């Protein structure tokens, strides 16, 4: 059993209604801590897609309340819909309109789930905020460090790179050393009905996967057609709006050519989608912005060999990083990588430790 310390603490648990956060609440409650469950109502799905029972709404809120009742802990539902729309949904929509491939789960963790929820937890007098994320917090020589979860199949460190050092000191991740199977066994041991509840797979505010309908409802007339141009300079056809395309896309281009073509660049200013052969996707280096750095400071002229992830589903790749001012870095792969997409995150690792990360810009070569 994972113990967060012998001293009884007041701990807020972010309860989503799923098995992970429910198991965390049960574990901490059994250890004798004063546990307070908080569930965030983030989105009225009927506003955009007419779906119910998706993450952080409907059935999930009910499930979280039932778990809290079984454990005998206080439970509160906080209406964060306006915060969520401003910080996550609007950012998601605007990112697509800028020709990027957004990552809303990171934005949600950065703003609503950590910044705003930590503030609420402190106002409640809590000593810590615990979540069901599969990452580890390890106390190093210079303070708290963020490390990958021990189960590589469930590791969520990529989505938490924006966590600040100050936030990391306050946060607890009791599941970081467990597998999903072990978590489900714990939930069963505690008699929680959510023990076998399936994991949510979709973006919470787009449960049917149709992100275009959300964009069009929030930003009407955003799918303006434009040119599809080959990277060699000649026009191949017309696209149906840049929101329908992402870097590396091959299917659904609606053009015929004598070899397979991929989306290699999106120009939102001139409303152009550039396509080319697979080799045109190869990238040697790129710039990241809004860097959140969790390790020792890098000197201005220093180059550091690290591993980086540019998609949550891709393995880390060896690279060299260097500072460009206060909040930018240059990332140079040791071997070229395909389909580096603006708007996605680049997370930087040294072994299992998360050193930091930033957002991929259009400055790609």
Curated annotation (Swiss-Prot):
Cystines in this chain: 108-204
Site (Interaction with tRNA): 133, 344
Region called Interaction with tRNA, residue ranges: 154-156
GO (cellular component) term, any one: cytoplasm
Residues reported to bind ATP: 14-21, 40, 132
Leader sequence residues: none
Catalytic-site annotation from UniProt: 108, 204
Molecular-function annotations in GO: ATP binding; tRNA binding; tRNA-uridine 2-sulfurtransferase activity
InterPro entries attached to this UniProt entry: MnmA-like (IPR004506), MnmA-like_C (IPR046885), MnmA-like_central (IPR046884), MnmA-like_central_sf (IPR023382), Rossmann-like_a/b/a_fold (IPR014729)
Superkingdom, natural source: Bacteria
An example Gene Ontology biological process: tRNA wobble position uridine thiolation
Pfam family, one: tRNA_Me_trans_C
Top EC category: transferase
PANTHER family in the record: MITOCHONDRIAL TRNA-SPECIFIC 2-THIOURIDYLASE 1 (PTHR11933:SF5), TRNA 5-METHYLAMINOMETHYL-2-THIOURIDYLATE -METHYLTRANSFERASE (PTHR11933)
Functional summary from the UniProt entry: Catalyzes the 2-thiolation of uridine at the wobble position (U34) of tRNA, leading to the formation of s(2)U34.
Protein name, as recorded: tRNA-specific 2-thiouridylase MnmA
Species in which this protein is naturally found: Rickettsia rickettsii (strain Sheila Smith)
């Amino acid at each position: 059993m994972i113990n967060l310390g012998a001293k009884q603490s007041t701990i807020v648990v972010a309860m989503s209604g799923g098995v992970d956060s429910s198991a965390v609440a049960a574990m901490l409650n059994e250890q004798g801590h004063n546990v307070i469950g908080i569930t965030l109502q983030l989105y009225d799905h009927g506003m955009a897609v007419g779906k119910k029972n998706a993450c952080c709404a409907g059935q999930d809120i009910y499930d979280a309340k039932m778990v809290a009742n079984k454990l005998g802990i206080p439970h509160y539902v906080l209406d964060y819909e306006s915060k969520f729309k401003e910080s996550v949904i609007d950012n998601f929509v605007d990112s697509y309109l800028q020709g990027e491939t957004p990552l809303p789960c990171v934005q949600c963790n950065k703003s609503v789930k950590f910044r705003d929820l930590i503030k609420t937890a402190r106002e409640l007098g809590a000593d810590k905020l615990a979540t069901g994320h599969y990452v580890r917090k390890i106390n190093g020589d210079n303070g708290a460090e963020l490390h990958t979860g021990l189960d590589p199949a469930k590791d969520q460190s990529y989505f938490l790179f924006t966590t600040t050092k100050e936030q990391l000191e306050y946060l607890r991740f009791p599941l970081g050393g467990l597998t999903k199977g072990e978590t489900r066994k714990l939930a069963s041991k505690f008699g929680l009905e959510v023990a076998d509840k399936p994991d949510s797979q979709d973006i919470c505010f787009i449960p049917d996967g149709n992100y275009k309908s959300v964009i069009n409802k929030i930003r009407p007339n955003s799918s303006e057609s434009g040119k599809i141009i080959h990277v060699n300079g000649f026009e191949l056809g017309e696209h149906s709006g840049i929101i329908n395309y992402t870097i590396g896309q091959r299917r659904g281009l609606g053009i015929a050519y004598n070899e397979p073509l991929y989306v290699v660049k999106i120009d939102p200013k001139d409303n152009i989608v550039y396509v080319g052969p697979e080799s045109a996707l190869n990238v040697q280096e790129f710039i990241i912005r809004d860097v959140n750095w969790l390790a020792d400071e890098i000197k201005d002229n220093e180059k550091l060999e690290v591993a980086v992830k540019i998609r949550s589903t891709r393995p880390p790749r060896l690279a060299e990083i260097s500072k460009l001012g206060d909040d930018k870095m240059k990332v140079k792969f040791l071997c070229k990588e395909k389909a580096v997409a603006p708007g996605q995150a680049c997370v930087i690792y040294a072994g299992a430790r998360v050193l930091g990360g930033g957002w991929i810009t259009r400055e790609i070569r």
